[in-house]
């Protein structure tokens, strides 16, 4: 039986098989709320060991864990540590560094100096030097969350729709341009500062469910949609040898 990797985020739930260190095709599962659909949970794969990375609400994580413990012989939950597989986290209290960010750094180690950007509910930015030292990062709202926040405070502002323009001439376009533009500007500023700090070239890596709307405006960027799962596979290999 295969081992399986599970990436449970705030709005997306993905999994992939893991066999002899090789990750299989990624499956996007129905996102499970606190009122979970029991049938959907029963459709989760079965295997030997399940490796779970979760930044979801505790109630959601608990529900998923309960089912995984039935479907698998063993379940291991990834957690951030100060140092792992060549990567050293900058936080004085590593447990406060999100496990998704931690795993994304593990997945990108070995690719030189990298600026790792995750676009989901939040927009996260982390700088990893080629020697494995994490040099810190930023957290902001993603463009999607920005629009949700604006709509929540001013219902007349549409939640979706519009096209990116540098100077928009209607509200929907202006919202897309402002929210996406804010994200692009923060990424570009961070990339500039990364170059200044390291005085070397820095690759820009993007992952997460919200990257599609930003990719056209970021120039030389590497899209790594399964970066967290890549990191989880590395974490799993370390855990298996402990």
Swiss-Prot record:
- Which note does the record give on the cofactor? A monovalent cation. Ammonium or potassium.
Q: Name one GO biological process term.
A: coenzyme A biosynthetic process
Q: What cofactor does this chain's UniProt record say it requires?
A: NH4(+); K(+)
Q: Work out whether the entry's keyword set contains tRNA processing.
A: no
List, from the UniProt record, the residues annotated as the active site of this protein.
100 (proton acceptor)
Q: In which pathway does it act?
A: Cofactor biosynthesis; coenzyme A biosynthesis; CoA from (R)-pantothenate: step 1/5
InterPro entries of this UniProt entry?
ATPase_NBD, Type_III_PanK
What's the Enzyme Commission number for this chain?
A: 2.7.1.33
Primary location group:
cytoplasm
Report the GO molecular function annotations.
ATP binding; pantothenate kinase activity
Signal peptide start and end residues? none
Q: Where in the cell is it found?
A: Cytoplasm
CDD domains found in the cross-reference section: ASKHA_NBD_PanK-III (cd24015)
Question: Which Gene Ontology cellular component terms are annotated?
Answer: cytoplasm
Look up the domain of life of the source. Answer: Bacteria
Amino-acid positions noted as binding ATP in the UniProt annotation, renumbered to this chain = 7-14, 121
Residue positions annotated to bind substrate are: 91, 98-101, 171
* Job of this protein: Catalyzes the phosphorylation of pantothenate (Pan), the first step in CoA biosynthesis.
What family is this protein classified in? Belongs to the type III pantothenate kinase family.
Matching PANTHER family: TYPE III PANTOTHENATE KINASE (PTHR34265:SF1)
In terms of NCBIfam families, this protein maps to: baf, PRK13327.1
> What is the official name of this protein in its record?
Type III pantothenate kinase
Q: Which organism is it from?
A: Xylella fastidiosa (strain Temecula1 / ATCC 700964)
What are the top taxonomic ranks of the organism? Bacteria, Pseudomonadati, Pseudomonadota, Gammaproteobacteria, Lysobacterales
